[in-house]
Amino acid sequence: MTNSLRLLRAVAGLLAWLSTPVFAQSIDPSFYYKLSTQFRGDGMKLDVFNGGPKNNLTRLEPDQDVSGQFWRFVGNGDGTFRLSTLFRGPGMCLDIFNGGANNNQPHLVRCGNFTGQFWNIMVSESGDGVRLTTRFRGPGMCLDIFNGGVNDNQPHLVNCGNLTGQLWTLTKTDKRVEGAP
């Protein structure tokens, strides 16, 4: 390999690293996180339905020490992350429904090479939270929270805007991912 080619590869690698959102660079894959929104506050965390017609869909629930509220972020090597829970394990990833009654709502499914499972974490313009988007729907659709109705407190992707339901806080816990370095 020529020196020019080595230099070009090194520069490309550096540029890829620099283009990764600053917040994404600080995710520690060895620990679980809890997720909350500015809209509902720190006392409500993202959790997973266990059973029934909404099995594996997500919702905000009061903060508890339950495995469905512990989220793991695993980098894909391109600045995106797969999200899984302690509850369902690393084989079930957060994905987005494409169509139907639950269109644009996140749910846990078997992990695979699906762009709905590739999540971007972008620091908000104000710097007081992060926005969560997927490669599937693109940077113009942000994870927000239903306010009222049958889906109250459940997340869904909507057009990004200046809404506190789209400003998420990722709180690192002291719970280590088993087998993580």
Q: Where are the regions that the model predicts?
A:
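Bacterial N-terminal signal peptides that target proteins for export
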Residues: 1-11
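N-terminal signal peptide c-region/cleavage motif recognized by signal peptidases
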Residues: 19-21
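Lectin-like carbohydrate-binding module/patch detector with strong preference for beta-trefoil
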Residues: 24-181
